Regions:
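Short, polar loop motifs at secondary-structure junctions
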Residues: 15-18, 112-116
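Active-site neighborhoods of divalent-metal-dependent phosphate/nucleic-acid chemistry enzymes
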Residues: 67-111
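Short loop/helix-cap segments at secondary-structure boundaries that form the rim of catalytic
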Residues: 22-26, 117-122
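A generic structural signal for short hydrophobic patches within well-formed alpha-helices
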Residues: 11, 38-41, 75, 117-118
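Generic structural signal for small/hydrophobic residues in well-ordered secondary structure
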Residues: 7-8, 41, 78, 103
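Short, well-structured N-terminal submotif of metal-dependent ribonuclease cores
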Residues: 1-33, 43-60
Length: 127
């Protein structure tokens, strides 16, 4: 096991002061973030009415964590996960397949509030 990875919704809830998200992060000793999550946060900040302050907030928060880039191994796992979900007749957002693949590649638990991640084989999801 290689620590935990945070999904976007955990970060948003944590920054909004959500107690359950704070407990979730406090219970983990090693946390990383997929570069895909960074992109989702960037997009969310860009489209918000408080773009500049949100960009600063996210950058400051993310500076405390290791950012995991997408590499060839993650791309291969992405293909496997997407095919596995297709065979089950399950559709989840593309970015979430990438996030799941990143967590699987590192054998990390995924901290998320999205239940659809539980459809991914061999991915430990913590809410």
């Amino acid at each position: 096991m290689n620590g935990d990875m945070m999904d976007t919704n955990v970060i948003i809830k944590y920054l909004a002061g959500d107690i359950s998200a704070k407990r979730l992060l406090d219970s983990s000793s090693e946390i990383s973030v997929s570069v895909i999550v960074v992109g989702e946060l960037q997009y969310g900040a860009q489209k918000s009415t408080r773009s500049k302050s949100n960009l600063e907030l996210f950058a400051n928060f993310l500076s405390n964590f290791s950012i995991v880039p997408v590499d060839e191994n993650i791309a291969k796992i992405y293909g496997e996960v997407k095919d596995q979900l297709r065979k089950k007749g399950i559709n989840i957002p593309e970015n979430d397949i990438w996030i799941a693949a990143t967590a699987k590649s590192r054998q990390s638990r995924l901290l998320t509030y999205d239940a659809h991640f539980r459809s991914v084989d061999d991915l430990e999801v913590v809410s």
